[in-house]
Amino acid sequence: PNHGGILVNLKRMNRILAIDPRNWNALIEPGVTYSQLQGELEKHSLRVATPLGSPPSASVLSSYLERNPVVTAADFIFGNELINTYDIVMPTGELFTVGHPPSEKARSMAPDGPALDFYRLFQGAQGTLGIVVRMSIRLLPLPKVQHVLFIPTDTVGQAVAVSQRIQRQELGLECFALNNFDLAAFLVADPAQDKNLRKGKYIGTYGAKRWAEEQVTQFQRLREALPAWTVIICLAGWARRPEEKVEYQKLDLRDLA
């Protein structure tokens, strides 16, 4: 820290304390990563909402506490209200539970309560007000049917207009726009990383390695070939009539076009 302080490495606090498949929530410690949590959630046909571009090695708790917006959201508020409750150790050593759960069995409840609302006080503080040691988060079901559509546009204004028309009708849970630089970066092949993923391994703590020369060349070609902006929308069907849901959303998109 620039002005003094203590850095605490919490990666060994990596237990998934509870998963509630019925109410779509989980209780985790700060060292739990996206890849670790998703590996367990798949056994229950659930998934964790992930910010765009976050590495699998990132801490779920830290990411949510810093309010990194996720793309699996119909609006910004939904994507930043994924925390139910959390326990924070104050500088005095006291344990403070945020979200006012009346008992241990109520951790998955909404954070509103009759007392003062400290729910957002510690969010975005980067640990300067205390250390969060447990957090209850909301989950999403794994889609049974999924279609990803790409809509090319020439300007950011057109991309925004298209996104607004789609989101007014709440079509798809993921809807966002990328310019050709960012989209090309996501599409560049990484043979070493692909090999690790097939083995069940993920990006290490310190992120991906420097690109090879052929990857740089591929990135430049992709960027030149891609449209200036691309709107990406994911249509997904969950437990009930997934094919039917995806089909009527595709028809609604055609009507918008």
What is the predicted role of each segment?
Residues N2, V60-Y64, L187:
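Short secondary-structure transition/capping segments
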Residues N2-G4, H100, D112-D117, L222-P227:
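Glycine-rich, flexible loop segments associated with nucleotide phosphate handling
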Residues P1-M13:
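Glycine-rich N-terminal segment of FAD-binding domains in flavoprotein oxidoreductases
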Residues V160-A257:
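C-terminal substrate-recognition/cap domain of FAD-linked oxidoreductases
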Residues G5, V148, T230-I232:
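Beta-sheet entry/capping signal
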